[in-house]
Amino acid sequence: MKKKLIFLFLMVYVVVSFSQSQRPNIVFIMTDDQSAIPVRTSDNQNQSRPFGFNGDDKVHTPIIDDLASKGIVFSQAYVSTSICTPSRYAMLTGKYAGRSEGKSFISSFPLGKLSRTANNIELEENITNLPRLLQTAGYTTAFIGKSHIIDHDILETYTQGTNGFMAYSKTADPYSTTVSNTMKFNHDKWSNRMKEFGFDHVNAFYPGNLRELFNNDLNIHNVEYKNKAVLDFIENTNEEPFFIYYSETIPHGPAPYWENSNGYYAGLDADVNLTAEGFLTQDYSYLPSRTDIKNEINGFSGKDPRHAWLRWFDHAVGAVVEKLRAKGKLDNTIIVITSDHGDFNKAKATNYEGGTKVPLMVYWPDGITTPRTYNELVQNIDFAPTFLDVAGVDTSNITLDGKSLKNVLTTNSTAVIHDDLFFEIGFSRAIRTKDWKYITVRYDDATNTKIANGDTFSGPNGTQVSLPYYIPNTSLGSLGAASYPLYHQKDQLFDVANDPYETTNLFESNPEKATEMRNLLRSKIVDISR
């Protein structure tokens, strides 16, 4: 009740310290499942790659790399949870996902109970968040792209015609006008629902992953479709300042870099007219054709043609930049490019670096005077405090776990923002300093009883395993466990400064550092306990 009263208070009184004309527009651009760690020759080559500014020389992202060279690159950027939904929650609230009081999460893990953070997190109906606060401060807010942060209970069944949605099958033909109209109806219903969480405009909306459109033909990426929605918003809004949450679906599965047996990629080879609204024809001539993009990358010696999707996305970012420039809004717009989490060497849904470390660059001509690389720790919980700070919003009565990066952006500051970072995923928690990381795996009482009794747990494809994975998603869990031999170890200590791939557990051999890091994690857990 207290939080609801705070929210209602904030809705009528937000302190704004800058005039409307001074406050920057914010364009927050996020990929899906993209690590910041370059892929080595010894690694599996058939996995997502980062941007060129992250040091990967097999990709071609000249537009994004140019923005990075004129802005700030954050070399030590992390997410607090290395899976989609909780990471996005942290970005839109400035809080650790384990604090969520969303209906699905709180029903499974009431306050005071050990939680298992996974894709069970949702934005709350009546608790303040970033877009709601920005709305109250006079910002026009827009949501474009993937959600996965509301109404999980509805998401699983909506295409069966539940909750006021219209039904269609996985094999329904989106080229059929009747089917496409049904898909359009559902898209618009989802979009209107998303508006209730603080967004004035919602378009090109995906309620979850591509497969959660529950149609075989629509299980493809469409960069142009989402990009045009962003450009249309910028073109048609005369309101300033504005905040755009631009959430791409690439490179999440179906991976746009995976070539099937017929030489087909579920992105650049798909029909540009297949969208979250069904079959929709629009003018995308402002972008190079998909064939031209593939040919461009194929023409570069030393580049990996499987990752032409990165140039596809790069062109989309360039289109946003040019639209802002044409409207005279580029200089006073903050452009952020990052990802919801990584998946380097199958570290998604773990607390290892490959899952938690993400690309991050910020471009802001009016605000950033000295382009550079910032080498201190930052985390996705810092986005909301930063955006609220530059918007002039008083956050003194708001629960925020993150810290504002405004001074890093607007001065030459190299000051440390975080001495340490906290991570949570399912049964695992972790703490990381600049040089060390401690990971712990702890089960709840019911799970410990099953283990003691010799019971087994669900594995992938109907198999049984002796120990549970961190999260209920057995596919992700099995990939992480197979890729990281230490996955199930109760206590893991890594000298990440010298062992960045976390191959050697020093918990037993360095008891002094182990005790220090364990106490640090305990203190953090106490501070954020629900």
Report the location of each language-model feature.
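Acidic, His- and aromatic-enriched active-site or binding-groove loops in soluble protein domains
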Residues: G98-K103, Y158-Y206
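Short catalytic/ligand-binding loop motif for oxyanion handling, primarily in non-cytosolic enzymes
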Residues: A36-P38, I83-M91, R99-E101, I149-I154, ...
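Polar, surface-exposed loop/tail segments
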Residues: M91, K146, I150-L155, D331-N332, ...
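Active-site-proximal cap/lid insertion segments
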Residues: P24, T31-K58, F185, K189-E196, ...
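Structural recognition of the beta-strand scaffold that forms the well-ordered cores
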Residues: V27-M30, P38, V73-V79, C84-T85, ...
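C-terminal, low-complexity/hydrophilic appendages and adjacent surface loops
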Residues: Y352-E353, E424-T504
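Active-site segment of extracytoplasmic enzymes that catalyze sulfate/phosphate-ester chemistry
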Residues: F28-I29, S35-N129, L133-F143, H152-N163
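Bacterial Sec-dependent N-terminal signal peptides
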Residues: M1-Q22
